[in-house]
Amino acid sequence: MKKSGGALRAGVIGVGIGSHHMRGYASHPRCELVAVCDLNVDRAKALAEKYGATYVFRDYRQLVSMDELDIVSVATPNYLHARMTIAALRAGKDVLCEKPMATRLGDAEAMVAEARKAKKRLMIDMSYRFNPLQQEMRRRIQRGELGEV
């Protein structure tokens, strides 16, 4: 469900590194930060107020079950990525998951399988790949300028 004007309605699980996701959603003209979730509810409430989120949860299952969300960011400790991502996908949400994708290959494969089954987008936040320096290094490697890598 998109809000009027077509903006994406986002929820963020984990407000440590997830605070960067919150800032991004809150500042983007086509996004609205709706909900945040963290075990540290006081910190979650403070950041929700700072970035304009309406809902604060301690349990990620409450956040992913919200009909008001289109996308969920998973920015929790690595061992929780698969569990929380799969729950969000099963709830019909697109997911942006922090790196690493998972701590075990089987978990990563299950995440991809669930995204395909749900016909939802799953993206792993490998933001350095968009960094101009990283892109230039990739081009040089592809041209063989740096020898065998």
Where are these regions (language model features)?
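Alpha-helical structural signal in soluble globular domains
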Residues: 24, 28, 47-50, 86-91, ...
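Alpha-helical elements of Rossmann-like donor-binding domains used by nucleotide-donor carbohydrate transfer enzymes
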Residues: 20, 46, 62, 71, ...
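N-terminal Rossmann-like dinucleotide-binding module
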Residues: 1-51
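A contiguous active-site-proximal alpha/beta segment in oxidoreductase catalytic domains
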Residues: 102-149
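Short, well-ordered coil/turn segments that N-cap beta-strands
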Residues: 8, 31, 54, 70, ...
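Beta-loop-alpha module in the N-terminal Rossmann-like domain of NAD(P)-dependent dehydrogenases
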Residues: 54-114
